[in-house]
Amino acid sequence: MNKPDVAKVAGEYERILVEFFELSAGLAPRFDLILLGMGNDGHTASLFPGTEVLNERTRLVAAPWVEKLNGYRFTMTLPVLNNAATVVFLVCGEEKSGILKEVLEGPPDQYPAQAIKPATGQLTWLIDRAAASKLKS
């Protein structure tokens, strides 16, 4: 899919969200629950480190180019994710233990997963023992 096509598809997905949630201009939908995972690089949804989509504040849906994947990825943007009533991260496996420690105990604002901060909602991390193995507590 080329850039004009992905922009069109992202725009259509956004239009559907606006229509379904009966949104006024500039408002983000409020999902009851959003389930997220986290990649070994600290990405979540399709919000990857170093991509411009992390700075998006007006669009609800974007299709950023992800260099390491050599392709576009569709994602809801931070205004949508952070407007949810509840966001739950599911993180499993020893291979995630290092990045989980960095995300939860390291400096803030280093990884996309750290940008998930529901404005008026709840954030929950569900992690297994292997993923938690490097955490302090």
Where are these regions (language model features)?
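Conserved phosphate- and dinucleotide-binding cores of soluble alpha/beta proteins
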Residues: 2-137
